[in-house]
């Protein structure tokens, strides 16, 4: 049992996965079943690209459903009321001075299952997330990233 991965997530992250799971089970499954029925009506399956496409989509969706169910079953929710304001952790919104970009950036530190770098939700397991966790306002840190070393100063922490 020790091989099971625990997914540390915020309430928002768990809700997002639950909503995706519900959509896949109630809407997407029905759509795919209908596509398969239509494709079967075309007859010969040996040269039926619609059927092959629908079956591939079905396999992908069923795989994603299993993945989401596993993630939710092994999710551990961060109590956002217990997120400290003096040290960076999962659930913290951290404002940093990025010396490379010469600008201030805000990151929400999340578990790996809900990371979304485009929206500044970075995983506690990513290089930057790992470098920020445990630090305090005023700390200046250098973090090894894939294209070198980035330097940040933690300006403030909120939730």
UniProtKB/Swiss-Prot annotation:
Q: Name one Pfam family in it.
A: GreA_GreB_N
Sample GO molecular function, one term: RNA polymerase binding
Sorted alphabetically, which InterPro entries does this protein's record hold? GreA/GreB_C_sf, TF_GreA/GreB_CS, Tscrpt_elong_fac_GreA, Tscrpt_elong_fac_GreA/B, Tscrpt_elong_fac_GreA/B_C, Tscrpt_elong_fac_GreA/B_fam, Tscrpt_elong_fac_GreA/B_N, Tscrpt_elong_fac_GreA/B_N_sf
Q: Where is coiled-coil annotated?
A: 14-76
Task performed by this protein: Necessary for efficient RNA polymerase transcription elongation past template-encoded arresting sites. The arresting sites in DNA have the property of trapping a certain fraction of elongating RNA polymerases that pass through, resulting in locked ternary complexes. Cleavage of the nascent transcript by cleavage factors such as GreA or GreB allows the resumption of elongation from the new 3'terminus. GreA releases sequences of 2 to 3 nucleotides.
Assigned protein family: Belongs to the GreA/GreB family.
Q: Which keywords does this chain's UniProt record carry?
A: Coiled coil, DNA-binding, Transcription, Transcription regulation
One Gene Ontology biological process: regulation of DNA-templated transcription elongation
Q: Which SUPFAM superfamilies match?
A: FKBP-like, GreA transcript cleavage protein, N-terminal domain
Q: Which domain of life is it from?
A: Bacteria
- Organism name: Clostridium kluyveri (strain ATCC 8527 / DSM 555 / NBRC 12016 / NCIMB 10680 / K1)
Q: What is this protein called?
A: Transcription elongation factor GreA
């Amino acid at each position: 049992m020790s091989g099971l991965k625990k997914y540390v997530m915020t309430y928002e992250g768990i809700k997002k996965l639950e909503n995706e799971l519900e959509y896949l089970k109630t809407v997407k499954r029905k759509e795919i079943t209908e596509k398969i029925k239509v494709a079967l009506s075309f007859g010969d399956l040996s040269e039926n690209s619609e059927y092959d496409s629908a079956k591939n989509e079905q396999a992908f969706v069923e795989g994603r459903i299993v993945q989401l169910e596993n993630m939710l079953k092994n999710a551990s929710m961060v109590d956002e009321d217990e997120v400290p304001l003096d040290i960076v952790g999962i659930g913290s919104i951290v404002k940093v001075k990025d010396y490379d970009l010469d600008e201030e950036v805000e990151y929400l530190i999340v578990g790996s299952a809900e990371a979304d770098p485009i929206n500044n939700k970075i995983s506690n397991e990513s290089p930057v997330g790992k470098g920020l966790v445990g630090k305090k306002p005023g700390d200046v840190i250098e973090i090894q990233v894939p294209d070198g070393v980035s330097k940040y100063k933690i300006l403030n922490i909120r939730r």
